[in-house]
């Protein structure tokens, strides 16, 4: 590759036109107010932090507020039944074009062909799971599979597809026990931003960029799930001590994720999302009977 001048490149002005969510999230993400095309954001959080719920809500908002844009959700782990359960908490999921990889024999070909259709914003859940499915269905090893996924994203980020669409990506990735990004450090260098989701009190969470090429970093934006959508707040709400008998106090989605992780760790059992939710509902019912 030889040196180039920006004026000699044919970069469309559309890459500077943000896709808005019409929420406080827009100014938090970029100085232009919204998610920009041709960006790759890694969304990092621990088990039960609400990464998937937040990302689905965000993609749904982008789709609703930008009707001419095409949005795609790549579900690497959860199948249609799992997501139907999740949609009872995040109704926007019902309207999203979703590519399911569970049980697919050739996910590599399916992902390639689907992305070639040209999408403005793609949510991938998750980088680890998708690259793992590539590894188990091809001759590529773990490192090569991860590189294949990253290379494919950057290909579409640069508009190298039949529709010349400069795709933006939200890519979920698990955090380590210490709360940091789990993966190759080169990913952090190459991407547009690293967005961390951290838990607060009850249903509250906050977002914080450790790196953001398109906006500010090390600034917190608080939010909570309320009536099927994320509600954003500039400051964390004051926690008021309850005057009535407490409930379990953990959001159902987060609790289900914890149950699933515990079953895997202690009993080496892989629960489906539906099984995890069923256990949570039974525990909640039992708890309510005990505190009557």
Locate the predicted segments by residue.
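Phosphate-binding/switch loop-helix module in NTP-utilizing enzymes
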Residues: 101-166
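Phosphate-binding/switch region of NTP-binding enzymes
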Residues: 155-246
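Short amphipathic alpha-helical heptad-repeat segments
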Residues: 247-263, 279
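Charged, low-complexity interaction regions
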Residues: 264-277, 291
């Amino acid at each position: 590759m030889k040196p180039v001048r920006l004026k000699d490149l044919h970069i469309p002005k559309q890459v500077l036109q943000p896709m808005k969510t019409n929420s406080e999230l827009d100014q938090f993400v970029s100085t232009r107010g919204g998610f920009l095309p041709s960006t790759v954001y890694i969304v990092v959080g621990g088990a039960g932090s609400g990464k998937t719920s937040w990302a689905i809500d965000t993609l749904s908002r982008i789709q609703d507020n930008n009707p001419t844009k095409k949005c795609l959700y790549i579900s690497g782990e959860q199948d249609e039944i799992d997501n139907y359960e999740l949609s009872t908490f995040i109704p926007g999921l019902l309207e999203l074009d979703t590519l399911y990889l569970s049980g697919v024999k050739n996910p590599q070909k399916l992902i390639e062909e689907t992305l070639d259709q040209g999408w403005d914003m793609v949510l991938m859940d998750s980088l680890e799971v998708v690259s793992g499915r590539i590894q188990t269905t091809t001759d590529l090893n773990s490192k090569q599979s991860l590189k294949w996924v990253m290379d494919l994203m950057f290909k579409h980020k640069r508009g190298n597809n039949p529709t010349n669409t400069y795709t933006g990506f939200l890519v979920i990735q698990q955090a380590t026990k210490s709360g940091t990004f789990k993966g190759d450090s080169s990913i952090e260098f190459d991407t547009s931003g690293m967005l961390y989701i951290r838990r607060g009190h009850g249903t509250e969470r906050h977002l914080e960029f450790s790196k953001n090429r398109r906006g500010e970093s090390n600034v917190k934006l608080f939010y909570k799930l309320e009536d099927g959508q994320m509600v954003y707040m500039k400051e964390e709400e004051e926690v008021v001590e309850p005057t009535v008998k407490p409930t379990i106090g953990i959001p159902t989605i987060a609790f289900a994720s914890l149950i699933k992780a515990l079953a895997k760790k202690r009993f080496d059992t892989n629960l489906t999302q539906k099984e995890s939710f069923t256990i949570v509902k039974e525990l909640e019912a039992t708890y309510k009977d005990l505190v009557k």
